[in-house]
UniProtKB/Swiss-Prot annotation:
Principal place of residence: nucleus
The protein, known as: Transcription initiation factor IIB
Family classification: Belongs to the TFIIB family.
Lineage: Eukaryota, Fungi, Dikarya, Ascomycota, Saccharomycotina
Basic and acidic residues biased stretches: 65-78
């Protein structure tokens, strides 16, 4: 029988071996054959079966449940459902499983009855709205941060008295738009409106009401609503998307971003909405690079009136020397002479 001393001697080790090794006091075999039996919580010698330790804590990863695991009638999950901080309930409730019974109809009826008793009615309504918000955000290809911010905004506002009488669609539309602005994801008022098909007047009123509510609740919740950022995303965030819709090259996009940055220095245009500044900056660079796209086409594609584009262009034309990257002019890429003049009244 091999002993600890004989193994150390054969390996050529010198000095005392300070390693602590659990060995079986009955077998005294080295190296020991110790087995951890997590099902019973015991540490057992594999040779003689002597229990060396009990009450063993299972340090392995928890079992998980996937969408179709319960079809076989056996659910290995021990951890339960993850809690949702957006819901009022504490998510600790009893559920009726399928089990091994053959009467599936009885099981479904029992599960339904249990759900009516345990589930909070308010949570059911909120969960239905969350599912709708998720579906709409997925349709618009919005990131998860927007979904979370929209759900938080809806949760904070949906049961307020000031929103009574407002349609569910307008509240969800306002929540998604607030979520976009909170997450600094560029989406316009009209884009969200076309996504949900809600009337402009009702949408606008609901949005203003929810803004006022959130200003008073901005310090609550796990997602703080920053009301200072709710005036609209910066105009630079719109330009790449708008240029993509128009099929413009990257050089035009970069030049339009330069123009939009410089617009902050012009008092006549600085007070305009970020969308207007973005569209007008793009239109000026379309003319600068002599791309055959009309103002009517730009307005139709980006959902801005042609009059708004032309009136904004008149302001930019007066300050054209400040709005075009001088490096492009120095390299001969563009010329200010490419910009058509504006008739003065």
């Amino acid at each position: 029988m091999m002993t600890r001393e004989s193994i150390d001697k054969r390996a050529g080790r010198r000095g005392p071996n300070l390693n602590i090794v659990l060995t079986c006091p009955e077998c005294k075999v080295y190296p020991p054959k110790i087995v951890e039996r997590f099902s019973e919580g015991d540490v057992v010698c594999a040779l003689c079966g002597l229990v060396l330790s009990d009450k063993l804590v299972d340090t392995r990863s928890e079992w998980r449940t996937f969408s179709n695991d319960d079809h076989n009638g056996d659910d290995p999950s021990r951890v339960g459902e993850a809690s949702n901080p957006l819901l009022d309930g504490n998510n600790l409730s009893t559920r009726i499983g399928k089990g091994e019974t053959t009467d599936m109809r009885f099981t479904k009826e029992l599960n339904k009855a249990q759900g009516k008793n345990v589930m909070d009615k308010k949570d059911n309504e909120v969960q239905a709205a969350f599912a709708k918000i998720t579906m709409l955000c997925d349709a618009a290809e919005l990131p998860k941060i927007v979904k979370d911010c929209a759900k938080e905004a809806y949760k904070l506002c949906h049961d307020e008295k000031t929103l009574k009488g407002k349609s569910m669609e307008s509240i969800m539309a306002a929540s998604i738009l607030i979520g976009c602005r909170r997450a600094e994801v560029a989406r316009t008022f009209k884009e969200i409106q076309s996504l949900i098909h809600v009337k402009t007047k009702e949408f606008g009123k609901t949005l203003n009401i929810m803004k006022n509510i959130l200003r008073g609740k901005s310090e609550d919740g796990f997602l703080k609503i920053d009301t200072d950022n709710m005036s609209g995303a910066q105009n630079l965030t719109y330009i790449p998307r708008f240029c993509s819709h128009l099929g413009l090259p990257m050089q035009v996009t970069t030049s339009a971003e330069y123009t939009a940055k410089k617009c902050k220095e012009i008092k006549e245009i600085a007070g305009k909405s970020p969308i207007t500044i973005a569209v007008v900056s793009i239109y000026l660079n379309i003319l600068l690079f002599q791309i055959p796209i009309t103002a009517a086409k730009v307005g139709q594609t980006l959902q801005v009136t042609e009059g708004t584009i032309k009136s904004g262009y008149k302001i930019l034309y007066e300050h054209r020397d400040k709005l075009v990257d001088p490096q492009l002019i120095a390299n001969g890429v563009v010329s200010l002479d490419n910009l058509p003049g504006v008739e003065k009244k």
